[in-house]
Design a protein with these regions (language model features):
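Extended HEAT/HEAT-like alpha-solenoid repeat tracts in very large eukaryotic scaffold/adaptor proteins
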Residues: 1-8, 47, 51-55, 97-105, ...
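Elongated alpha-helical scaffolds that mediate protein-protein interactions in large eukaryotic proteins
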Residues: 1-37, 41-50, 57-77, 89-99, ...
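Amphipathic alpha-helical segments within extended alpha-helical solenoids and repeat-rich scaffolds
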Residues: 28-43, 73-89, 114-136, 153-195, ...
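Sequence-level detector for tyrosine residue identity
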Residues: 36, 102, 111, 118, ...
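Long, compositionally biased, phosphorylation-prone intrinsically disordered terminal regions
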Residues: 40, 110, 145, 150, ...
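Eukaryote-biased recognition of C-terminal alpha-helical segments
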Residues: 43, 54, 315-322, 338-367
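Short inter-helical turns and helix N-cap capping residues of alpha-solenoid HEAT/ARM repeat scaffolds
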Residues: 43-44, 90, 94, 204, ...
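Eukaryotic scaffolding regions of large macromolecular assemblies
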Residues: 208, 215-336, 345
């Protein structure tokens, strides 16, 4: 099979007319085209490599053939198989098959098909988050980070940006639901397993971290940020959704449920980006009670890995700066806060120091 696929690939390489004719026929005739999606599912890296090279050679630099692929039943089957392979190989990104699969998905995204692929795979997955959708988001996130610094990626049109904005809200709501179920712990084991499937929870968490990071990146591309995307986030009430997510994370016992730590870091970063030079968002986060939640992130938590805990604190300080800048109402909230106690940390004890609160200020003295 590998030799036969390679032979077809050799015949079509450099033959644009032949590639176009054959590709259209494969996409039109499900019986013929399905052969190649089935080859992608074979447990043989050589066969998979030859098949991916064939697919990439057919669609490379062809907007028309990419369009045909994402809309054809045969093409969708190929995409499912390719994304499955990417998921299987994601821990070995130097693998040649991973590179080929990435190149195919990347080519389709370049022609503006991210949303089409996402919706198609979602529809074939009972609208559940899964590894294929997560890998699709990972490819998009990787492409955005690899793009020229300070410039908006030209493969992100209105449809793609709107989809990303909607995913932030959708995945926040799903994650909050999951965390509430964990916190309450009131359902029977059978009910929990039916509602909170482990794989589903894992994929929601991974996808949400990615989509929060992607959104923050788009908002901080340059001094002005992505103004169109920001308005979409505002329209989707993402500030409220992310604040609710952060609030829910605060209620979790981080020592027992450490898996949600990264959500706090990326939530704070996005909230800070939304409030940057925007009086509407500054006022909104005050009105929904978000300022104390942001302030609470300035401490370093023992449950967090050290570097991520520090990053969380830095993002929280930056977010507070954006929230308080030229906003007297927000500044007044901070001014009204009074210190209650000085926390004695293990590090201070080891250094022989004791923290005391004197006239509202923290003082250190020898223990």
């Amino acid at each position: 099979m590998q030799i036969g696929t390679q032979a077809i690939c050799n015949m079509l390489t450099g033959n644009m007319a032949g590639s176009k004719l054959v590709w259209k026929e494969w996409m039109r005739d499900a019986d013929r085209g399905s052969v190649y999606s089935e080859l992608l599912a074979i447990n043989d890296d050589g066969v998979i490599m030859a098949t991916m090279i064939l697919i990439l050679n057919c669609i490379r630099n062809s907007e028309e053939l990419c369009q045909i692929m994402v809309n054809a039943k045969t093409g969708v089957a190929m995409l499912n198989s390719i994304l499955n392979d990417l998921e299987r190989l994601h821990s070995d990104e130097q693998n040649k098959n991973f590179e080929l699969g990435y190149a195919i998905i990347s080519q389709l995204i370049d022609y503006g098909h991210f949303t089409t692929i996402y919706k198609t795979i979602e529809n074939t997955s009972d609208n559940k988050m899964n590894g294929r959708l997560t890998m699709l988001i990972k490819v998009l996130d990787s492409k955005i980070h690899a793009y020229k610094e300070g410039e908006v990626p030209d493969f992100l049109g209105h449809t793609e940006l709107k989809k990303i904005s909607g995913l932030v809200r959708q995945l926040c709501q799903r994650a909050i639901f999951v965390m509430n179920q964990v916190i309450e712990g009131q359902q029977q084991e059978q009910e929990i397993s039916s509602v909170l499937e482990i794989d589903d929870v894992s994929e929601v968490y991974t996808a949400l971290v990615l989509i929060l990071q992607t959104s923050s990146t788009l908002l901080t591309l340059n001094d002005q940020g992505h103004t169109v995307f920001k308005e979409m986030l505002i329209e989707d009430d993402v500030l409220k959704s992310v604040t609710d997510l952060l609030t829910c994370c605060e209620t979790m016992d981080q020592k027992k449920q450490p898996g949600f730590n990264y959500l706090k870091r990326d939530s704070v970063r996005l909230l800070g980006a939304l409030c940057h030079e925007d009086r509407r968002m500054q006022d909104k986060i005050r009105e929904i009670g978000g300022i104390p939640i942001i302030l609470a992130q300035c401490k370093i938590e023992d449950a967090n890995p050290c570097k991520y805990s520090i990053y969380l604190r830095e993002y929280a300080i930056l977010a507070l700066r954006n929230i308080l800048k030229d906003n007297h109402e927000n500044q007044a909230i901070i001014a009204e806060l009074e210190p209650k106690e000085a926390v004695q940390t293990d590090e201070l004890t080891e250094m022989g120091l004791k923290a005391k609160l004197v006239n509202g200020e923290v003082k250190l003295e020898k223990a």
